[in-house]
Every structure is written in structure tokens, then in C-alpha cells.
Amino acid sequence: MHCGLLEQPDMDSTESWIERCLSESENKCYSSHTSLGNISNDETDEEKENRASKPHSTPATLQWLGENYEIAEGVCIPRSALYMHYLDFCEKNDTQPVNAASFGKIIRQQFPQLTTRRLGTRGQSKYHYYGIAVKESSQYYDVMYSKKGAAWVNETGKKEVTKQTVAYSPRSKLGTLLPEFPNVKDLNLPSSLPEEKISTFIMMYRTHCQRILDTVIRANFDEVQSFLLHFWQGMPPHMLPVLGSSTVVNIVGVCDSILYKAISGVLMPTVLQALPDSLTQVIRKFAKQLDEWLKVALHDLPENLRNIKFELSKRFSQILRRQTSLNHLCQASRTVIHSADITFQMLEDWRNVDLNSITKQSLYTIEDSREEHRKLIIQLYQEFDHLLEDQSPIESYIDWLDSMVDRCVVKVASKKQGSLKKVAQQFLLIWSCFGTRVIRDMTLHSAPSFGSFHLIHLMFDDYVLYLLESLHCQERANELMRAMKGEAHGEIREERVLGEPAISTPSPVPFSPAASSSSVEIPSATSPVSNQSPEVGVVAATTGTMQSYTWSLTYTVTTAANGPGENGQQVPCMRSPHMTPSVTHRIPVYPHREDGYTGSYNYGTYSNQGHHPIASQYTSLPHESGLSGPLYTAYHRSSSQYPFNSQTRMEPCLMSGATRLHPSQVAPRWPDVTSTNTCFTSPTMHSARYANTSDMYTSLAPRRNSDYEHMQHFPGFAYINGEASAGWAK
């Protein structure tokens, strides 16, 4: 029984060694064994201890902890994993390790603020050290246990996907505190704003935001609505006069930016970490409902306050939706990237791409393309080639995308303030063009790994957009911070979120059956300043016989109880000799009970509206001198076109027995062609219209099923006749 240890010359007392041998034999009697008869880890640890020739040194252990670990808020390391690092350190230094309990006391000597948490599902929970992270310079560095906190990777470091993925839960972030809010001492307040009122408002608003964050962490999203309503509608009367000041509006914008960033980090710390399906659905629902909750809560408050709240909430909702979709794509892409066979085929197809041709076509999107742009594209191409060749994990691809955006957008935009949006748009244009040409080249050459590249391309596109949207939000927060401190003057610029046009949100007013004059406005993609299309007035002449026109698809339906001519407005696509202004009725969202609210919208007044004839706004075209009248005959928008009381506006068109959209047949310009407003309720009617047309595209023949190995290179996507169909695989 380890009698050889008694012969060591550096023993101080044989009695201590006898006691140790007795304790070891007792531990062996109660050691556990696996089902295959393998000795447990306890015996392995004992063998390591017995092989050690040096006694344990606490100062050396403390020095090792300081060199390899650091304090980091929000990072958890399993207690067993940290102890395994310690055993490895002892083995390499030939020192005798202490047990786990004694090692825990040594850790707290180095990091006194360290806490312990029990995390995991019921029956599988484990103790974790909370607030400590592995340094990037450490040999034990793992992204999962670092400050970056990128993803859950397996402990062995292999590239195969772990069979059991640990699902993230926001409840692990309970107790998270918001960062510091602006201090009233740092603000340049005007004389009309009392400092004590602003200080009180900041304190109240921080408490309100902290309650919202705690509610989100507990996943009780429905309570957020009541918090918003109670805070804004229950505002003390003496605080109402200061809410409309630009200083308070900027303070609210800065605080909302801090809150939304904290919520985003709590719900999804990283897009690479797997989320439960239930949490994903709840996050999407929360992003959809937040705007409606704010409309209700901010009723009757100053317009500039509502505008800044709506703007930031829309950006926040867009980022949440982007994160959920990106998380799904990352989980599907992980399977592709971590497969050695697939990455080898992808590397071979990647090197067969015509890089010179694609680079030239991509540089056409730049007004003043230079040689440095071409070199940068080639450099990025080679970096991606190295990632495929090294069979890097998905975390390396994410780091590469981060560095690419930093080099191409952040550093370029930092040279000139306020140029981030323009630089980001130019980068997105080149990025989209290059990726599209690569996919096209692989399609033409029937690349075997086309499906895998398509999936990776989708994930890369979403992640780049996510990074740019985050940069956009950060720049907006910095603008509000400068405006709040008095460093910037002028009105706050309203910028649009990438990928989502800015839509002006109407202010809700109490609904009253007497006030029936209303209009339903469909927002335009053009500038909100001018409602005129480029074609109003003189039609510019172009070279040649062909002349193209761009007509705005924006229209406004104006209704009035007194008649068709009151407060009517014609928009660019509606032909009329002049434009008349209209006041848009703001549909109620949360009306007061005393105003007759019945729980639903009342569209009864729409049945009394009159017809609105659309006169000609454009004269005869120069190259069609034979036309003396308008291009189209006038038609009327009747109440049957907008059946608001039905479930959907398209329901009458989809039902075979429904009435026509127009009460009477409209005389078309070309009599031999069926009217464009006709609903085709049978294939016979559809073929009758297009039977004699020669300019229709013929149906493409389905690809052979042997062209692609469907599921080998395209996991997570369904194939229909050889074509990939992406969707949420829930």
C-alpha cells in the first residue's frame, strides 16, 4: 500500500505518512466505479498526488491564479473545470494538489469578491464560480469562459458538435444592475429647468428602468406593459411641465439606450449560444408588442418625447428580431462548419471561384475605386480561405467578421465624424455584390458545396447587418449624449435603421363616435418632407424612343362624413391637377373609457363615405401624340374596397362567391386583356388571360435530384425539386 513512499529521504515523520496511507485506503473503499469497471477520477487524482515530489505551495498557486484569471462581471466557470485547471498546473509543476474545498479557500484569497452559484436544469445543476474569467493570454483560454463569452464549446476543443447543447436562461443574470445613468451635475441645464426636478426625474426613471430589466430577466414580459403604463400615465403633475424640454428628452434617449443594451445582453449574450425555442418565441413576441405598449403609455405626452421613445424602441425591436434569426442560422451553420468533409469540399469550391472577375464587378459599385480596395478584397478572400483550410470553429468566423467590419467601417468612419451611415451603406453594397457573384459562380459551375455556402452566406449577411445596426444604435446614443451635455446644437437628426424604413408613428387620441372624419395613411418610402413624385409637372425628355417613368406607390384613403370633397388629398400616383392638404386622423390605441371605448375599433362611418374621382394629373406623353385623354379612365374607391369589418381586406377577393372590387365594370385601355382587378377564381380564367401572350416566362424545368447531394451539404434546409427552401425549423 504505497510503501515506497516511506523510503523517501525528505520525510519528516513516518507517522504522518502512515496516517495518510490509512486515509487513502479508506477513500479507496468508498470510491465509485463506472459501469465498465474503470476507476473513478478520485483514484486518478490520488495517483497524481502520489507522483508529486514537491509539497503544495499556496504562494505559487496564488501567483498562478493571478496570471491566468481575472475578475469579469457576468462570466461563470464551473467549479469542476477550474479545479481541473489547478490539477493540470500541479502536475506540470510536480507539486501536490489540495482538495477542492481547500482550493476554493485559496481562490477566495486571490479574488475576495468571487461568488458561487448553482446553475443548470433540475437534477443536473452544478456549482459555478461567478465573476471570474480566463485571461486571453492563459493556456486555459476558452471563449466560453472569457470576457467575450462567445459560445459554448466542448471541453476537449474538438471541432465536432457536442451532442448535448446547454440552453441559455436569462434567469442566470438575476441581480444584474444597470450601468450608471447621467448625473445632473454633468449636464448643462437651462435656467428654466430646476436642477432638483431633473435630479428627481433621473432617479425615478432609473428605478423604472431597473424594474423593467428585472422583469425581463425573470421572463415576465407581460409585466413590462403595466410598468410602462403606470410610470408615464402616473407621472406626478409637477413633473409634467419638464417632460417636453429638449434636455429631458435627450436624457430619456440616453437612458433608454442604456436599458435596451442591457436587455439585449441579458436575453442573448451571444448570437452563437443556443436558445430554447420557448425563449425565442417570447423574445419575438416582446419585440412586436413593445411599440404598441409605448403608444398606449405615452398618450397625451409631449410629441418630442414620444418621437425619441418610438425611434429607439423600433431600433431595439429590430435588433432583437435580428438576434433571434441570426441565432437560428448560427446553430445550423455550426453543423456545416464543424464537419471536416464539408469544409474540405467548400475549400475546393472556394478556390475554383473566378476571383478576378468577381472583384472587378464588385468594384463597379464604388465611384472612385482604387487599387487599395482591390487589395483589401483579395486579402479578405485569402483570410476566409485560411479559415476553411484550418477547419476553424464557428467562433473564428465570427471573430473574422468582427475584424472585417472594424477595418472596413469603424476605422474608416472614425476619420470623419458623422460619416458612419454613408460608409456602412457603401460597405454593404460591396459586400452584397461580392457575395451574390460568388453564389452565382458556384451555381453556374454546379459546386457540390453550394448548399453549404448558401447557408454560410445567409449567416454572414445577418451577422454583418447585426453589427452595423449595433454601431448605428451606439452612434445615435453618442449623439444624444453630446446633445444632453450641450456639446451639440440643433435639432436631433432622425436616422433610419438599416434594413427597416423609418415610419412616422401617429399619436393616439381619444376615440369619439362624433369625430368620424378620418383617414388611413399608408407611409411612403420617399422623403416625408415632400409628397410630390418626380413626375409632377414637366416630364423630362430622354434620349431615344424609350422613356421610363417611376411612379410612387404611396396613396392615402381620405374619408369624411360630410362629403367626398372635404379634406381630400391626392397623392402622387393619383392623377389630379393639384394637390390638396389633408389632416390625418390618428387611430386611437388606448382611448379613455368615458369617450365611448368598447374594446374594438369603430369603422361604421366608412360606409357613408362618398366616391373620390381621380382626375388626370399628367398630360399626354410626347411620344404618344394620338392620346388626347388620360392614360387610364377614372375609377372610384368605394366602401366595398376596404371592408374593415372583415378579417382581411383580401378576403372578398379570395372567396369565389364574393362580389367584385368595383361595383361596375371599368372600361380597360386594352379591351382584349382582362382587367387587372379581376380575381382569378379558377385556373381556366387565369389561362384565358395569358393564353395568347408571348412575353410570359415559361416555367423552369425542375432540376435533377442527382445534381446536388441535398442533405449532405445543406442541413437545416428543405429541398423542393432541387431548390433550397429556408424556414424556421421549430
UniProtKB/Swiss-Prot annotation:
GO MF, one example = DNA-binding transcription factor activity, RNA polymerase II-specific
SUPFAM superfamilies documented for this protein: Winged helix' DNA-binding domain
Which protein are we looking at? Regulatory factor X 4
Q: What happens when the gene is disrupted?
A: Morpholino-mediated knockdown in embryos results in the failure of neural folds closure at stage 18. Impaired ciliogenesis in the neural tube.
**Which Pfam families did the record assign?**
BCD_RFX (PF25340), RFX_DNA_binding (PF02257)
Tell me a GO biological process for this protein.
regulation of transcription by RNA polymerase II
Q: Which residues bind DNA?
A: 61-136
Answer yes or no on keyword Nucleus: yes
Question: What GO cellular component is one of the record's annotations?
Answer: nucleus
Chain's role: Required for neural tube ciliogenesis during embryogenesis.
User: Polar residues compositional bias: what residue ranges?
Assistant: 30-41
State the organism of origin.
Xenopus laevis
**Region described as Disordered:** 30-59, 500-532
Q: Which UniProt keywords apply?
A: DNA-binding, Nucleus, Transcription, Transcription regulation
Task: Provide the family line.
Answer: Belongs to the RFX family.
Q: Which InterPro entries match?
A: DNA-bd_RFX, RFX-like, WH-like_DNA-bd_sf, WH_DNA-bd_sf
